[in-house]
């Protein structure tokens, strides 16, 4: 796909080359600052220096010499000092963008930059035998948005849910189930029972040292493949994943793989040996395998008792992914507090000779806080579990939908409430830089005004409502002239719709879904201004009405695509 703004840049380059004054290899087209009345700029300093001419004179000469062809997307060409400024031809741009959105449909905004390359995205990663809480939601939501964005960039994307299903804590869980019995419930209730068993055993263990030995024995039995230990462990894994899947289904999250840490168990001895042989790690006086790389703090790869740690399993995971998927990128969507861990992981992997030409990326994120700024924490007693959070969001959205749309059927109101409530949770996470902490502020999250998912969904539903009414009144036409869209608010909206492919590229380059969220918000805002200033169904002429209806349709389709990249539904009604 070659979009309008790409053709615009090509037109500029061709027009400059056609003057014979600057060769193609000296032309670099940039986006000017917002206060510059231009869409693209050629800054002549570098070219003028190479050609031995004055940059101001070169810009002026080019402005005089350039004559865009009749079908070019170039509008005006002006020189300001050493800056050669280009504006888009508004009518030709409108025709091009309307045609692209109609032709490409759901694929509008997608590009082929990542063709024949693979990205592995590691996200969500809940712990087995524990309920998912709001602490898991950021990785899940950000990771799923990155999956959508990189697929839109043309990559083959492998979404991997790296489950925390191994480690010393399982000795306690298995010992607790043997001591007190396994939970009899299902779903979240069973998960809550497991957590209570773990806490009960942990508390008793402090005053009863033999219980600690028992937990250690179960941990060792699990590692050695004891059938009873493995059966109990698998029961915990299956129970946890069934409960987690209900949350994933509501959030629209789909994984390609869900390999747990246990999957890499057989690789660990080989990984430790490779780390030693490559010189990436060494044995200390206590017999532990440690590494000290890139001026980072020393870290353990294998404990002195022979046990492995998180980083051991993470090294094995990278090795497997390189062999299995041959990726160009491996992206980890993990809490910012793990930043040092990933610096150490990437350093030792490269010191072992792996992933030398692969982008290893850690996408960090902040914590979720209450409206008064307090972090949500199990220890503080204010932790919110994910299922409860989603239920609460949908219940609040249902109250709003019932109040605003009482004539809709109960089934339709329930569907809209689910889309709006879940959308509010997702957008609240994605609309800003992920490094920042986010706040659970329901009033803002569910407002149909301002920067919220509900506002964006309402804008989309408003577009669809206008189009339904136009269809009912026989106003839709196949004969449309986008060149009639000359009002400034129409042209601003068209220009912004044209930016979606650029926003997708920027979001991928920065690993930042908030770029798409910002594009969606600006789309809704520009549509609101257009709708206020330009009557659609009561336009001055039928031809202008047809052009504006086409713009409404294009806005709805592009906004739906933008929301889909974030994992948010776009209801037809609200």
From Swiss-Prot:
It catalyses: tRNA(Arg) + L-arginine + ATP = L-arginyl-tRNA(Arg) + AMP + diphosphate. GO terms for molecular function: arginine-tRNA ligase activity; ATP binding. It is found in: Cytoplasm. It comes from the Bacteria. A motif ('HIGH' region) lies at residues 126-136. GO terms for biological process: arginyl-tRNA aminoacylation. Belongs to the class-I aminoacyl-tRNA synthetase family. Monomer. This is Arginine--tRNA ligase. The gene is argS.
